[in-house]
Design a protein with these regions (language model features):
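Bacterial Sec-dependent N-terminal signal peptides
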Residues: 1-29, 37-40, 439-440
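Bacterial Sec-pathway N-terminal export signals of envelope proteins
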Residues: 20-69, 73, 226-271, 344, ...
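Short flexible linkers and secondary-structure junctions
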Residues: 22-151, 285
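Sec/SRP-type N-terminal targeting helices
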Residues: 44-48, 61-62, 114-142, 192, ...
Length: 440
């Protein structure tokens, strides 16, 4: 008896362990999007691109400052034959040969660019535009991550609601089978009617298994995106979503899409690149200054040799070669301009379509609410008729199926309204703003 009691206790502990293996976590849409933006690889990539563009801008700006170099050389000379015109000619006797066996040379130079056809100025403008473009691209990336969370939330909620409704319907169907079994045993109904009820139970079980699978897949995709433990089961706070939607109704706004702003800045950068290419037609001027110290052993020592001057350079070949570079820059600018025009048209189409989809979902939701009331009343009437032998088993099972379908459509339509609402906010570039999420 003691062994049996111990075994039962262990089994109970195992059962408790299994029950608590999965952690249920209630999440609002706002919380989930915040987590995704902070933890997702896409967000990290966008942040890294912004940092790279910022460093590229700083690197370009560094070219404004003077360049400074120092150098030194020490060389050993072997049997150098040195003749110097600096030797005195006052003596008629030949000078003793000089022993020159080493050379010391030290230099310090500073160069300051003055003019290069405004190349540096326009290069900085290009880098600034690209940096700003990456910041807006990052914001659009965050919006896209938010939309992905919305879609996963909708999929998970639909699957969870279907699971609940089908499971509830399964209980009713199983109870019907029990009732029909008793009636069949008492000769009140034909065996064929019992088989139809049993077949309905089998079909409902298959639908329930499929709904559970869909819920598990949607839940796994969501927790993977949010970087949550695999044992987490997300419980969607649908009431918080309804409050957010009511508090922030859609407001039409054009020109707010961050991808449009990013591409517009890329266009500005491409136009600056044309000026950079054209700057090669101009000469370059620079100020330079330096210091030289030299010691040629037993011959010459130079110290405090300061120098300064103006540097001038001009690449004559640029007259012939630079034309293609300018044409290339102009072609890239035109390419960006056409891409911006295309994106503008695409955004207008997306906003229009998203608006139509949202309005349709609202209308469908009203119809599905009416359908639930109609299907429930129809089932009640058919059930009364069946109980009074005025309708067939087929009529009863069909009415039950129509009621379940109406309930499922109603639940799915509520999720569709929320999904289409946030898709419209995304198309208008206001998804994160509608949830009062600030972007850095």
């Amino acid at each position: 008896m003691k062994k049996q009691a111990s075994l039962l206790f262990l089994l109970a502990l195992l059962g408790l362990g299994t029950g608590y293996a999965q952690e249920k976590r209630k999440l609002t849409l706002k919380e989930a999007i915040e987590m995704a933006v902070q933890n997702s690889t896409s967000a990290d990539l966008a942040t890294t691109k912004v940092k790279s563009a910022e460093l590229a801008l700083a690197n370009t700006k560094n070219n404004q400052y003077p360049g400074a170099k120092i150098s030194g050389q020490y060389m050993r000379l072997s049997s150098a034959n040195v003749k110097s015109n600096l030797q005195s000619n006052s003596s008629s006797e030949p000078a003793a040969p000089l022993k020159v066996d080493q050379l010391l040379l030290g230099q310090a130079n500073v160069t300051m660019p003055i003019f290069s056809g405004f190349k540096l100025k326009n290069s900085i403008k290009t880098s600034e535009s690209l940096y700003k473009a990456e910041t807006f691209a990052k914001k659009h990336s965050n919006e896209a991550i938010g939309l992905e969370v919305v879609e996963l939330f909708a999929s998970l909620y639909k699957a969870q609601q279907m699971t609940l409704l089908i499971a509830d319907n399964l209980k009713t169907a199983e109870q019907r089978v029990k009732d029909f079994t008793a009636m069949e045993e008492n000769g009140l109904i034909a065996r064929n009617d019992l088989l139809k009820a049993q077949l309905q139970v089998s079909n409902i079980k298959l639908a329930l298994d499929n709904a559970k699978k869909n819920a598990a897949v949607a839940n796994y995709e969501l927790i993977t995106l949010l970087k949550l433990p695999e044992s987490t089961i997300v419980d969607i706070d649908i009431e918080a979503i309804k409050k957010d939607m009511a508090a922030h109704p859609y407001q039409k706004s054009e020109g707010e899409r961050n991808d449009l702003k990013a591409l517009s800045l890329q266009k500005a950068a491409a136009e600056s690149e044309i000026k950079v290419a054209k700057s090669n037609y101009y000469p370059s001027l620079s100020l330079s200054g330096g210091y030289i110290a030299l010691d040629l052993n037993n011959v010459l020592t130079v110290t405090n040799a300061m120098n300064f001057g103006l540097g001038f350079s001009y690449d004559l070949s640029s007259i012939f070669k630079n034309g293609k570079q300018v044409q290339f820059a102009q072609s890239k600018a035109k390419e960006t301009s056409l891409a911006l025009e295309q994106l503008n048209e695409q955004v207008k189409e997306e906003v229009f379509q998203a608006n139509e989809n949202y309005n349709l979902s609202l209308k469908q939701s009203v119809v599905y609410d009416e359908a639930v009331a109609q299907a429930s009343e129809n089932y009640r009437i058919v059930k009364d008729k069946y109980d009074n032998s005025l309708s067939t088993t087929n009529d009863l099972l069909e009415a039950d199926f129509e009621q379940l379908q109406a309930q499922i459509n109603q639940a799915l339509s509520k999720a569709d309204v929320a999904q289409k609402y946030y898709e419209l906010q995304f198309a208008s570039g206001q998804l994160l703003n509608s949830l009062q999420l600030t972007q850095n």
